[in-house]
């Protein structure tokens, strides 16, 4: 019996791969850190219209997520980019850096 091959067609949702990558990054990061409750992952588009996934961890866990010579961070970025099925930047911040960044952001109004 011969199996029918399905064409590898992209989903009708262009962000489906990026959302899957965001969920996967959250899962992996929570397994790596000592403070999994503080892990936050956000997906947004930067000013150059490039998708960005931002991983925010407790300051004590930053070294675990980056790894020796950045090996863990490189592996996480590789997995996320493969899952996203497209270009995506992965930024890794500690929660203190993220809080400072949001204070520096311009407010509307």
Give residue spans per PLM region.
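RNA-contacting regions in translation and RNA-metabolism proteins
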Residues: 1-62, 74-75, 79-109
């Amino acid at each position: 019996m011969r199996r029918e091959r399905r064409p590898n067609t992209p989903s009708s949702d262009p962000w489906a791969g990026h959302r899957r990558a965001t969920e996967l990054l959250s899962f992996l990061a929570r397994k790596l850190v000592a403070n999994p409750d503080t892990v936050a992952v956000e997906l947004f588009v930067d000013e150059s219209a490039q998708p960005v996934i931002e991983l925010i961890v407790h300051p004590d866990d930053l070294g675990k997520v980056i790894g020796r010579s950045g090996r863990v961070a490189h592996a996480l970025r590789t997995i996320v980019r493969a899952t996203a099925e497209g270009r995506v930047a992965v930024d890794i911040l500690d929660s203190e850096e993220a809080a400072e960044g949001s204070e520096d952001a311009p407010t509307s109004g």
